[in-house]
Regions:
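Active-site environment of divalent metal-dependent phosphoester hydrolases
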Residues: 2, 23-25, 43-47, 66-67, ...
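Short Pro/Gly-enriched beta-strand edge/turn motifs at strand-loop
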Residues: 68-77
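Short beta-strand-initiation
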Residues: 1-3, 71, 82-84
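A generic structural signal for short, solvent-exposed coil/turn residues
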Residues: 9, 51-53, 79
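Active-site metal-binding motif and surrounding structural segment of the metallo-beta-lactamase
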Residues: 22-68
């Protein structure tokens, strides 16, 4: 599954979202003064703690708020085994989502630009509905920009239940069992 991380820059400060340690980290850290590492999904440990310690910045795991930042934290999912926060950046009209929405075949079934996570399709969480981003930054798959970003969110919700059989059919054999 294609994984992505994001470096969000505002006022010379950089917030690293669900980062992966690799060559890209040097480029991300060079964008400005590191302000924090944000882990938006409880199980997206990735390299968050290591990177935060190395940079000497806070590691905020599934935060309810991001103090000193331009982001609004959204409680995307709050279930016993799934805690996820999304970020809304009003000034940039950017929505950052770790797992609820993604742009990879496991989420989309190959039919949608953006799709809902398989396990959430029967009862989609309503927390992200209504946001009309111009930039949709995702934890899996390529980000979506422009009018497709907002319509991608709405389409993912509108087709969540209806396309569930199609998504299940498209899962790789190793996942189906």
């Amino acid at each position: 599954m294609e994984r992505a991380f994001h470096a969000l820059v505002d006022g010379g400060r950089v917030w690293l979202v669900d980062p992966l340690d690799g060559p890209e980290m040097e480029d991300a850290a060079a964008l400005g003064e590191p302000a924090g590492v944000l882990q938006l999904l409880d199980r997206h440990n990735r390299d968050c703690a290591t990177i935060a310690a190395r940079l000497g910045v806070p590691h905020l795991k599934v935060p309810d708020a991001v103090p000193g930042s331009p982001f609004e934290a959204i409680a995307a999912v709050r279930l016993p085994r799934w805690r996820e926060t999304a970020l809304w950046w009003p000034a940039r009209k950017a929505l950052v989502v770790a797992e609820v929405l993604a742009a990879n075949p496991m989420h989309t079934g190959g039919r949608e630009r953006v799709g809902m996570h398989l396990f959430l399709r029967p009862w989609p969480p309503q927390s992200l509905r209504g946001y009309r981003p111009e930039h949709l930054l995702l934890g899996h798959g390529h980000s979506v920009h422009g009018p497709e970003a907002g319509s991608g969110v709405e389409t993912a919700y509108a087709r969540a239940r209806r396309d569930l059989p199609w998504v299940l059919k498209g899962l790789p054999g190793s996942v189906r069992g």
